[in-house]
UniProtKB/Swiss-Prot annotation:
One of its GO terms (molecular function) is nickel cation binding. The gene is ureF. This is Urease accessory protein UreF. UreD, UreF and UreG form a complex that acts as a GTP-hydrolysis-dependent molecular chaperone, activating the urease apoprotein by helping to assemble the nickel containing metallocenter of UreC. The UreE protein probably delivers the nickel. Belongs to the UreF family. Signal peptide: none annotated. One of its GO terms (cellular component) is cytoplasm. Keywords: Chaperone, Cytoplasm, Nickel insertion. HAMAP family: UreF. Its main location: cytoplasm.
Length: 228
């Protein structure tokens, strides 16, 4: 088993590398509106986000960031690639519909950059600026030599695991049902990951009006941050 194969488990762990944080991402609003009341509704919500949610755009950015890191590492178009890197990072952060979501992104990114630094891979590209979670995830996968398809699959898996962990605390739905949902999500994660690999960024459709409203209705999302 290769080192990169083992290192990817650091990224998909529900406790690492983001400090044991578990963000609810507006689930309380769905719960308050009675749109989220059992394991089936939780599963349907996560599947919907995987199919048409903004998380798809985040996943696509992973690939763009990864390609940029490769080119910079090869000494190709360093200046223009760095500008593109910063521009895409700023763009994906600004696409988040609430301050809390942007703060979540930057907190998680900082934690992951801290981890990769401990492994000997310090991020040197404007690290004093606010960085997005996709940027940090892509950097970690680039450093750990994880393949692009595994990078995307692991990203979706970790995100869905975080959502299920939050749902387990909010509803609750029970740990056994949570594990069953995660199992059932594997096929859709694999399918969506392959779709993302074959698409250009302009081809990524997402509709997250409901999620945006849920997050904005939940005035202080950061208070719903659970520590494991």
């Amino acid at each position: 088993m290769t080192k990169s194969h083992l290192l990817k488990y650091l990224l998909t762990s529900p406790n690492l590398p983001v400090g044991g944080f578990c963000y609810s991402e507006g689930m309380e609003s769905y719960l308050h509106n009675k749109n989220l009341n059992d394991s089936n509704s939780v599963k349907e919500l996560i599947i919907s986000e995987l199919k048409i949610g903004q998380i798809r755009l985040d996943a696509k950015l992973l690939l763009d960031f990864f390609d940029i890191f490769n080119e910079i590492n090869d000494g190709k178009n360093a200046k223009s690639n760095l500008q593109k890197l910063l521009s895409l990072n700023k763009w994906i952060l600004s696409s988040k519909d609430s301050i809390e979501m942007r703060e979540q992104q930057t907190q998680m990114a900082k934690s992951l950059f801290d981890l990769t630094k401990e492994f000997g891979f310090e991020y040197l590209y404007e690290n004093n600026k606010k960085s997005s979670w996709p940027l940090a995830w892509s950097w970690a996968c680039f450093c750990f030599e994880i393949t692009k398809i595994e990078m995307v699959e692991n990203f979706f898996y970790a995100w869905s695991a975080n959502q299920l962990s939050a749902a387990l605390r909010i509803i609750p739905i029970g740990s056994t049902k949570t594990q069953l949902i995660q199992r059932d999500l594997l096929a859709i994660i694999s399918k969506v990951s392959k779709e993302i690999m074959d698409k250009q960024i302009d081809d990524i459709y997402f509709g997250n009006v409901g999620l945006a409203m849920a997050q904005q209705n939940h005035n202080d999302l950061y208070t719903k941050l659970f520590r494991n």
